[in-house]
């Protein structure tokens, strides 16, 4: 009886494994076809990338929170701007960064900003304060969220990372900021900025 039970168990396990393998193979075949099909073609997608090896001659700086201090790091870079600042932001509620941007605009620096639509309703967003300072602010109309955190300064510096331009990012969260001084990289980020600008809406109040 024991040998029959063992045989039955062995056959059952083999049967289950066979079904599982069949499902796996079929699923792999199915998703491979989807990826290769015209409806989900990766070969036709235009992908802009930048090889990290090309950054070997670039000046790269980093900042991390905690401890606090990355807001000051960003403000210092904005204060050094001479010609232009192009910015993309999800959260935009930090007073120090906002003041630095307004001061840059007042001293003749071209300041252009794209924000996520959530800033239209966020209580602490600086959107309207920036608008009142005559800064060109647009709302990125991407179907999801505009989650970029990017500042391009004088077409040669890129500030990016996980850091939202908010007090929480500096005082409460674990975040990172990276500053890369590289004209080619800045050009790549500018191309993306302008591509998002073409699908953005102006803010009226």
UniProtKB/Swiss-Prot annotation:
Enzyme class at the top of the EC tree: hydrolase
Cell membrane among keywords: no
One GO CC annotation: extracellular region
Keyword Heme among record annotations: no
Gene Ontology biological process terms, A to Z: lipid catabolic process; phosphorus metabolic process
Highest taxon of source: Bacteria
EC number: 3.1.4.4
CDD domains on file: PLDc_Nuc
Domain PLD phosphodiesterase span(s) in chain numbering: 142-169
Reactions catalysed, as given in the entry: a 1,2-diacyl-sn-glycero-3-phosphocholine + H2O = a 1,2-diacyl-sn-glycero-3-phosphate + choline + H(+)
GO molecular function: phospholipase D activity; RNA endonuclease activity, producing 5'-phosphomonoesters
Keyword line: Hydrolase, Lipid degradation, Lipid metabolism, Secreted, Signal, Virulence
Residues annotated as signal peptide: 1-22
SMART domains, A to Z: PLDc
Subcellular location: Secreted
Catalytic residues in the record: 147, 149, 154
Summary of subunit composition and partner proteins: Homodimer.
Function as written in the Swiss-Prot or TrEMBL entry: Could be a virulence factor.
Similarity comment: Belongs to the phospholipase D family.
UniProt-recorded name of the protein: Phospholipase D
Organism: Rickettsia prowazekii (strain Madrid E)
Lineage, top ranks: Bacteria, Pseudomonadati, Pseudomonadota, Alphaproteobacteria, Rickettsiales
Gene that produces this protein: pld
């Amino acid at each position: 009886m024991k040998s029959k039970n063992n045989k039955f168990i062995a056959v059952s396990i083999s049967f289950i494994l066979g079904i599982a393998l069949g499902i796996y193979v079929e699923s792999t075949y199915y998703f491979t076809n989807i990826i290769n099909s015209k409806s989900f073609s990766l070969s036709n997608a235009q992908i802009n990338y930048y090889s990290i090896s090309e950054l070997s001659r670039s000046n790269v700086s980093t900042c991390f929170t905690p401890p606090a201090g990355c807001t000051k790091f960003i403000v210092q870079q904005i204060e050094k701007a001479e010609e232009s600042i192009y910015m993309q932001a999800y959260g935009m509620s930090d007073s120090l960064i906002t003041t630095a941007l307004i001061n840059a605009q007042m001293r003749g620096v071209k300041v252009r900003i794209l924000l996520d639509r959530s800033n239209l309703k966020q209580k602490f967003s600086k959107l309207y304060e920036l608008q009142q300072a005559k800064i060109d602010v647009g709302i990125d109309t991407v179907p999801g969220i505009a989650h970029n955190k990017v500042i391009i300064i004088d077409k040669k510096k890129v500030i990016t990372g996980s850091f939202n331009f908010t007090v929480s990012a500096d005082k409460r969260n674990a975040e990172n900021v990276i500053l890369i001084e590289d004209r080619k990289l800045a050009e790549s980020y500018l191309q993306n900025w302008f591509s998002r600008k073409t699908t953005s809406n102006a803010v009226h109040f």
